[in-house]
A protein has these predicted regions:
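Transmembrane beta-barrel strands of outer-membrane/channel proteins
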Residues: 43-53, 87-93, 130-136, 175-181, ...
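Repeated loop/turn-to-beta-strand initiation elements of outer-membrane beta-barrel proteins
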Residues: 81-87, 121-130, 168-175, 207-214, ...
Length: 344
Protein backbone atom coordinates (compact mmCIF):
# COMPACT_ATOMS: atom_id res chain seq x y z
CA UNK A 1 0.00 0.00 0.00
CA UNK A 2 1.40 3.33 -1.01
CA UNK A 3 2.47 5.70 1.71
CA UNK A 4 0.60 8.52 -0.03
CA UNK A 5 -2.71 7.00 0.96
CA UNK A 6 -1.49 6.40 4.50
CA UNK A 7 -0.48 10.07 4.74
CA UNK A 8 -3.98 11.10 3.70
CA UNK A 9 -5.42 8.91 6.46
CA UNK A 10 -3.04 10.37 9.03
CA UNK A 11 -4.19 13.87 8.06
CA UNK A 12 -7.83 12.77 8.36
CA UNK A 13 -7.19 11.25 11.78
CA UNK A 14 -5.53 14.45 12.98
CA UNK A 15 -8.46 16.48 11.69
CA UNK A 16 -10.87 14.32 13.66
CA UNK A 17 -8.78 14.67 16.82
CA UNK A 18 -9.18 18.38 17.50
CA UNK A 19 -11.35 19.42 20.49
CA UNK A 20 -13.81 21.25 18.22
CA UNK A 21 -15.26 17.84 17.42
CA UNK A 22 -15.77 16.78 21.02
CA UNK A 23 -19.54 17.16 20.68
CA UNK A 24 -19.55 14.15 18.37
CA UNK A 25 -19.06 11.86 21.36
CA UNK A 26 -22.61 12.52 22.58
CA UNK A 27 -23.88 9.86 20.23
CA UNK A 28 -27.20 10.21 18.43
CA UNK A 29 -29.42 13.03 19.62
CA UNK A 30 -32.86 11.72 20.58
CA UNK A 31 -34.44 14.74 18.90
CA UNK A 32 -32.60 14.17 15.62
CA UNK A 33 -33.14 11.24 13.27
CA UNK A 34 -30.36 9.06 11.90
CA UNK A 35 -30.76 10.42 8.37
CA UNK A 36 -30.70 14.02 9.61
CA UNK A 37 -27.46 13.42 11.49
CA UNK A 38 -25.96 11.56 8.52
CA UNK A 39 -26.59 14.61 6.35
CA UNK A 40 -24.70 16.92 8.73
CA UNK A 41 -21.33 16.44 7.05
CA UNK A 42 -18.49 18.06 5.16
CA UNK A 43 -15.94 16.62 2.80
CA UNK A 44 -14.61 16.90 -0.71
CA UNK A 45 -14.64 15.41 -4.19
CA UNK A 46 -11.64 15.50 -6.45
CA UNK A 47 -9.26 14.04 -8.97
CA UNK A 48 -5.51 13.49 -9.15
CA UNK A 49 -2.73 12.47 -11.52
CA UNK A 50 0.55 10.79 -10.56
CA UNK A 51 3.48 10.11 -12.87
CA UNK A 52 6.33 7.88 -11.70
CA UNK A 53 9.60 7.26 -13.57
CA UNK A 54 11.97 4.57 -12.23
CA UNK A 55 15.33 3.26 -13.45
CA UNK A 56 16.90 0.26 -11.72
CA UNK A 57 20.52 -0.66 -12.43
CA UNK A 58 20.23 -4.30 -11.39
CA UNK A 59 22.51 -7.01 -10.05
CA UNK A 60 22.74 -8.44 -13.58
CA UNK A 61 24.26 -5.20 -14.91
CA UNK A 62 21.19 -4.31 -16.97
CA UNK A 63 18.89 -1.34 -16.52
CA UNK A 64 15.16 -1.82 -16.01
CA UNK A 65 13.05 1.24 -16.85
CA UNK A 66 9.51 1.63 -15.54
CA UNK A 67 6.96 4.38 -16.08
CA UNK A 68 3.69 4.34 -14.15
CA UNK A 69 0.78 6.74 -14.63
CA UNK A 70 -2.03 6.72 -12.07
CA UNK A 71 -5.15 8.78 -12.74
CA UNK A 72 -7.68 9.15 -9.96
CA UNK A 73 -10.83 9.52 -12.02
CA UNK A 74 -13.01 10.17 -9.00
CA UNK A 75 -12.42 10.52 -5.28
CA UNK A 76 -14.89 11.44 -2.54
CA UNK A 77 -14.30 12.14 1.15
CA UNK A 78 -17.11 12.19 3.75
CA UNK A 79 -16.58 13.71 7.22
CA UNK A 80 -19.32 13.72 9.87
CA UNK A 81 -18.19 15.82 12.85
CA UNK A 82 -21.17 14.80 15.00
CA UNK A 83 -20.27 11.12 14.69
CA UNK A 84 -16.50 11.70 14.57
CA UNK A 85 -16.51 9.53 11.46
CA UNK A 86 -14.93 9.88 8.03
CA UNK A 87 -14.84 7.74 4.90
CA UNK A 88 -12.86 7.88 1.67
CA UNK A 89 -13.39 6.24 -1.72
CA UNK A 90 -11.28 6.60 -4.84
CA UNK A 91 -11.39 5.06 -8.32
CA UNK A 92 -8.06 5.03 -10.15
CA UNK A 93 -6.76 3.91 -13.53
CA UNK A 94 -3.17 2.68 -13.53
CA UNK A 95 -0.78 2.02 -16.42
CA UNK A 96 2.72 0.62 -16.00
CA UNK A 97 5.31 0.22 -18.76
CA UNK A 98 8.49 -1.78 -18.15
CA UNK A 99 11.48 -2.02 -20.48
CA UNK A 100 14.49 -4.32 -20.03
CA UNK A 101 17.13 -5.31 -22.60
CA UNK A 102 15.34 -7.92 -24.72
CA UNK A 103 12.09 -7.74 -22.74
CA UNK A 104 9.09 -5.46 -22.27
CA UNK A 105 5.96 -5.56 -20.15
CA UNK A 106 2.78 -3.44 -19.95
CA UNK A 107 0.19 -3.59 -17.19
CA UNK A 108 -3.19 -1.84 -17.16
CA UNK A 109 -5.31 -1.87 -14.03
CA UNK A 110 -8.26 -0.44 -12.13
CA UNK A 111 -7.80 0.35 -8.44
CA UNK A 112 -10.52 0.89 -5.82
CA UNK A 113 -9.58 2.62 -2.57
CA UNK A 114 -11.77 2.34 0.54
CA UNK A 115 -11.03 3.94 3.90
CA UNK A 116 -13.11 4.21 7.09
CA UNK A 117 -12.01 6.21 10.14
CA UNK A 118 -13.88 6.31 13.47
CA UNK A 119 -12.51 8.63 16.14
CA UNK A 120 -13.18 9.10 19.85
CA UNK A 121 -12.41 12.26 21.80
CA UNK A 122 -10.83 11.53 25.21
CA UNK A 123 -10.65 15.13 26.42
CA UNK A 124 -7.71 17.35 27.38
CA UNK A 125 -6.25 17.14 23.87
CA UNK A 126 -6.28 13.34 23.66
CA UNK A 127 -8.09 11.35 20.98
CA UNK A 128 -8.10 7.80 19.71
CA UNK A 129 -9.74 5.77 16.98
CA UNK A 130 -9.20 3.21 14.27
CA UNK A 131 -8.76 3.25 10.50
CA UNK A 132 -9.55 0.39 8.13
CA UNK A 133 -8.35 0.60 4.53
CA UNK A 134 -8.63 -1.63 1.50
CA UNK A 135 -6.90 -1.19 -1.85
CA UNK A 136 -8.26 -3.59 -4.45
CA UNK A 137 -6.61 -3.74 -7.88
CA UNK A 138 -7.48 -5.77 -10.97
CA UNK A 139 -5.06 -5.63 -13.87
CA UNK A 140 -3.87 -7.32 -17.06
CA UNK A 141 -0.25 -7.89 -18.09
CA UNK A 142 1.03 -7.98 -21.67
CA UNK A 143 4.54 -9.17 -22.58
CA UNK A 144 6.24 -11.38 -25.20
CA UNK A 145 5.20 -14.38 -23.08
CA UNK A 146 1.69 -13.51 -21.85
CA UNK A 147 -1.24 -11.67 -23.39
CA UNK A 148 -3.78 -10.31 -20.93
CA UNK A 149 -2.58 -12.29 -17.90
CA UNK A 150 -5.00 -11.40 -15.10
CA UNK A 151 -3.87 -10.20 -11.68
CA UNK A 152 -5.88 -9.38 -8.56
CA UNK A 153 -4.38 -7.68 -5.52
CA UNK A 154 -6.16 -6.94 -2.22
CA UNK A 155 -4.24 -4.94 0.41
CA UNK A 156 -5.81 -4.61 3.86
CA UNK A 157 -4.69 -2.27 6.63
CA UNK A 158 -6.14 -1.86 10.14
CA UNK A 159 -4.65 0.91 12.27
CA UNK A 160 -5.72 1.87 15.79
CA UNK A 161 -4.27 5.29 16.59
CA UNK A 162 -3.66 7.68 19.48
CA UNK A 163 -3.20 11.45 19.10
CA UNK A 164 -2.49 14.37 21.39
CA UNK A 165 -2.39 18.15 20.93
CA UNK A 166 -1.51 20.79 23.51
CA UNK A 167 -3.19 24.10 22.60
CA UNK A 168 -1.18 26.10 25.12
CA UNK A 169 2.23 25.07 23.81
CA UNK A 170 1.21 24.17 20.21
CA UNK A 171 2.71 20.70 20.09
CA UNK A 172 1.31 17.22 19.68
CA UNK A 173 1.82 13.81 18.16
CA UNK A 174 0.14 11.18 16.01
CA UNK A 175 0.82 7.47 16.54
CA UNK A 176 -0.59 4.22 15.23
CA UNK A 177 -0.08 0.47 15.32
CA UNK A 178 -0.85 -1.25 12.00
CA UNK A 179 -1.81 -4.77 10.99
CA UNK A 180 -1.41 -5.33 7.26
CA UNK A 181 -2.27 -8.22 4.99
CA UNK A 182 -2.11 -8.48 1.21
CA UNK A 183 -3.04 -11.28 -1.16
CA UNK A 184 -2.18 -11.31 -4.86
CA UNK A 185 -3.45 -13.78 -7.45
CA UNK A 186 -1.19 -13.67 -10.53
CA UNK A 187 -2.95 -16.43 -12.51
CA UNK A 188 -0.29 -18.51 -14.31
CA UNK A 189 2.43 -16.65 -12.40
CA UNK A 190 1.18 -17.96 -9.06
CA UNK A 191 0.14 -16.33 -5.79
CA UNK A 192 1.76 -14.08 -3.20
CA UNK A 193 0.77 -13.18 0.36
CA UNK A 194 2.30 -10.67 2.78
CA UNK A 195 1.39 -10.24 6.45
CA UNK A 196 2.92 -7.97 9.04
CA UNK A 197 2.80 -5.15 11.56
CA UNK A 198 4.10 -1.61 11.71
CA UNK A 199 4.47 1.15 14.27
CA UNK A 200 4.43 4.88 13.47
CA UNK A 201 5.10 7.83 15.79
CA UNK A 202 4.98 11.44 14.59
CA UNK A 203 5.58 14.30 17.06
CA UNK A 204 5.26 17.89 15.79
CA UNK A 205 5.55 21.46 17.07
CA UNK A 206 4.08 24.71 15.70
CA UNK A 207 5.95 28.03 15.76
CA UNK A 208 3.64 30.68 14.31
CA UNK A 209 3.36 29.87 10.60
CA UNK A 210 5.95 27.10 10.89
CA UNK A 211 5.40 23.47 11.81
CA UNK A 212 8.28 21.08 12.47
CA UNK A 213 7.86 17.35 12.90
CA UNK A 214 9.51 14.00 12.47
CA UNK A 215 8.02 10.65 11.46
CA UNK A 216 9.47 7.46 12.95
CA UNK A 217 8.42 4.16 11.36
CA UNK A 218 9.16 0.46 11.86
CA UNK A 219 7.65 -2.54 10.03
CA UNK A 220 8.02 -6.32 10.12
CA UNK A 221 6.45 -8.61 7.53
CA UNK A 222 6.37 -12.25 6.38
CA UNK A 223 6.24 -12.97 2.63
CA UNK A 224 5.25 -16.12 0.77
CA UNK A 225 5.26 -16.50 -3.01
CA UNK A 226 4.29 -19.70 -4.83
CA UNK A 227 4.04 -20.70 -8.48
CA UNK A 228 0.76 -21.81 -10.03
CA UNK A 229 1.80 -25.43 -9.40
CA UNK A 230 2.31 -24.73 -5.69
CA UNK A 231 6.12 -24.82 -5.65
CA UNK A 232 7.85 -22.20 -3.51
CA UNK A 233 9.30 -19.11 -5.17
CA UNK A 234 9.96 -17.19 -1.97
CA UNK A 235 9.63 -17.61 1.78
CA UNK A 236 11.10 -14.58 3.54
CA UNK A 237 10.81 -12.14 6.40
CA UNK A 238 11.15 -8.41 5.93
CA UNK A 239 11.79 -5.44 8.18
CA UNK A 240 12.02 -1.72 7.48
CA UNK A 241 12.72 1.38 9.54
CA UNK A 242 13.06 5.05 8.67
CA UNK A 243 13.16 8.54 10.10
CA UNK A 244 11.53 11.40 8.16
CA UNK A 245 11.93 15.04 9.31
CA UNK A 246 9.13 17.32 8.07
CA UNK A 247 9.11 21.12 7.69
CA UNK A 248 5.91 23.00 6.82
CA UNK A 249 5.14 26.71 6.36
CA UNK A 250 1.60 28.12 6.13
CA UNK A 251 1.23 31.37 4.19
CA UNK A 252 -1.33 34.00 5.11
CA UNK A 253 -3.09 33.51 1.77
CA UNK A 254 -4.03 29.88 2.65
CA UNK A 255 -1.05 28.29 0.92
CA UNK A 256 1.11 25.59 2.53
CA UNK A 257 4.67 24.70 1.51
CA UNK A 258 6.20 21.52 2.92
CA UNK A 259 9.32 19.39 2.60
CA UNK A 260 10.15 15.90 3.86
CA UNK A 261 13.40 13.94 3.82
CA UNK A 262 13.38 10.20 4.54
CA UNK A 263 16.40 8.18 5.58
CA UNK A 264 15.84 4.49 6.13
CA UNK A 265 16.81 0.91 5.51
CA UNK A 266 15.16 -2.45 5.05
CA UNK A 267 16.26 -6.06 5.06
CA UNK A 268 14.82 -9.21 3.47
CA UNK A 269 15.92 -12.62 4.77
CA UNK A 270 15.10 -15.58 2.53
CA UNK A 271 14.52 -19.04 3.95
CA UNK A 272 16.45 -22.14 2.88
CA UNK A 273 13.54 -23.25 0.67
CA UNK A 274 13.24 -19.99 -1.30
CA UNK A 275 13.62 -20.54 -5.04
CA UNK A 276 15.16 -18.55 -7.86
CA UNK A 277 18.67 -18.71 -6.45
CA UNK A 278 17.58 -16.93 -3.26
CA UNK A 279 17.89 -19.78 -0.74
CA UNK A 280 19.40 -18.33 2.46
CA UNK A 281 20.15 -15.07 0.64
CA UNK A 282 19.70 -11.77 2.50
CA UNK A 283 19.04 -8.38 0.89
CA UNK A 284 20.00 -5.04 2.47
CA UNK A 285 18.64 -1.76 1.14
CA UNK A 286 19.44 1.88 2.00
CA UNK A 287 16.60 4.33 1.32
CA UNK A 288 16.90 8.05 0.63
CA UNK A 289 13.83 10.06 -0.34
CA UNK A 290 13.05 13.79 -0.57
CA UNK A 291 9.63 15.36 -1.14
CA UNK A 292 8.68 18.97 -1.88
CA UNK A 293 5.03 19.98 -2.09
CA UNK A 294 2.67 22.94 -2.13
CA UNK A 295 -1.06 23.24 -1.35
CA UNK A 296 -3.16 26.29 -2.19
CA UNK A 297 -6.75 27.09 -1.33
CA UNK A 298 -8.53 28.84 -4.21
CA UNK A 299 -11.68 30.68 -3.23
CA UNK A 300 -13.87 29.16 -0.55
CA UNK A 301 -14.11 25.64 -1.94
CA UNK A 302 -11.14 24.60 -4.07
CA UNK A 303 -7.84 23.12 -2.92
CA UNK A 304 -4.98 22.49 -5.37
CA UNK A 305 -1.88 20.43 -4.57
CA UNK A 306 1.38 19.67 -6.36
CA UNK A 307 4.19 17.42 -5.16
CA UNK A 308 7.58 16.26 -6.44
CA UNK A 309 9.48 13.32 -4.97
CA UNK A 310 12.95 11.96 -5.63
CA UNK A 311 14.03 8.56 -4.31
CA UNK A 312 17.34 6.74 -4.38
CA UNK A 313 17.64 3.16 -3.10
CA UNK A 314 20.84 1.11 -3.06
CA UNK A 315 20.55 -2.62 -2.41
CA UNK A 316 23.15 -5.29 -1.69
CA UNK A 317 22.81 -9.03 -1.12
CA UNK A 318 24.70 -11.61 0.89
CA UNK A 319 25.39 -13.95 -2.06
CA UNK A 320 25.31 -13.52 -5.84
CA UNK A 321 23.61 -15.93 -8.21
CA UNK A 322 25.65 -17.32 -11.10
CA UNK A 323 24.13 -14.99 -13.69
CA UNK A 324 24.59 -11.79 -11.65
CA UNK A 325 27.42 -9.40 -12.47
CA UNK A 326 27.70 -7.17 -9.39
CA UNK A 327 26.64 -6.94 -5.76
CA UNK A 328 24.73 -3.69 -6.01
CA UNK A 329 21.34 -2.70 -7.39
CA UNK A 330 20.45 0.99 -7.50
CA UNK A 331 17.05 2.55 -8.07
CA UNK A 332 16.47 6.19 -9.01
CA UNK A 333 12.88 7.40 -9.03
CA UNK A 334 11.13 10.67 -9.90
CA UNK A 335 7.45 11.15 -9.02
CA UNK A 336 5.13 14.08 -9.80
CA UNK A 337 1.72 14.25 -8.13
CA UNK A 338 -1.08 16.75 -8.92
CA UNK A 339 -4.44 16.95 -7.15
CA UNK A 340 -7.56 19.13 -7.28
CA UNK A 341 -10.28 18.98 -4.59
CA UNK A 342 -13.66 20.68 -4.29
CA UNK A 343 -14.60 21.02 -0.63
CA UNK A 344 -18.12 21.24 0.72
Amino acid sequence: MKRTLISVSVAAALALSFPTLAASERGMDSDTGFLDEAMQFGGHVGTSLEYEDKVTDGFDGNKKKEKTTTHEVFGVYYNNARWNLSALYGLKLENREQRNPGYHENEDGIKHLFSLNKGFDLGNGWATGAIYELEYTRSKVFSPYVSGLRKELAEHSFRPYLTYFNNEHNWGFYSNLEYLYSSEDKSAWGERTEEGYSLLFKPYKRFGNWELGVELYYQIKDNEDRSSSGSINEISDFNEKYIEPIVQYSFDDAGVLYARVRVGENETNNAANSGGGNANVDYFKDIRKATLGYEQAVGDNWLLKGEYEYANEVEEKSKLAGWEAKNESELKQHTVYLQALYRF
